[in-house]
Amino acid sequence: GTFTIHYDSRIFLDSESPAELFSAAQLLQQEIETQTGFRPAICRRHQPVGSHLIYLTASPELSREAYTLAVTPENITICGSLESGVLYGVQTLRQMIRQAGAVLPTVLISDKPAMENRGFYHDATRGRVPTLSYLKQLAATLSFYKINQLQLYIEHSYLFDDLTEMWRDDTPLTAEDILELDRYCKGLGIDLVPSLASFGHLYKLLCTKSYAHLCELEGSASAPFSFYDRQAHHTLDITNPESLSLAKHILSEYMQLFSSKYFNLCADETFDLGKGASRALAEEKGTTVIYTEFVTELA
């Protein structure tokens, strides 16, 4: 059998369902209008009656992010968990509508994620700095495929208050951009996780006049640019107390913009460690030890 979306089809929210379901209903409404030309009205009512209706309801009995999607010749019912379950049911229905249009095959789907964390890591540093509009499009696409975590990697591409030398020739993301993106992602069931370079390949930062002296390798700031050099060098000099203060400062400013309980320190690729200013310390303690000590201080 089939279910046909009519010009008089409506989307009903259970009167007991949380207000967040309205956003999922709007997402479905926009998809139906785009694919079929019909724009179903969204209603909220206890025990709606009629045919060719789409019901969205939340159930605390379903496991986290789980949902059921039932398509019958009369109606469509999506029942999901309180945490993104209804949203994921809507995303599946959107995918069906893109394939079948207004005439959908009858089906019963019971679905839940096999992996709790399904993340996408986005580099917002190398190449052009993405705009807020682009990042929202990316988040919408990720949610469509039920990705629930987006890590935004930053080096120089955020407008740190007192680091104008670092970003002045770029178009960095602002605090307002991040706050808006965080809010937008949350509405799509995505945890926006901050990811900030804090130890290695700090090319733009350690090439400034104010902070070049904190680079592990002397003279790195004046070396000709190359993509390899940008990645392989420009590690903080851990023997200088200013390095730890600087790293903590940028981490503190950036992490406060996010509602996520996670933070990615990105203290990787410190290829220069122990080869310049910290050579003597590395020979005394070992590179692994001095690396671990610095990262522990950061955390």
Positions of PLM-derived features:
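Contiguous, structured surface segment used for ligand recognition
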Residues: G1-R118
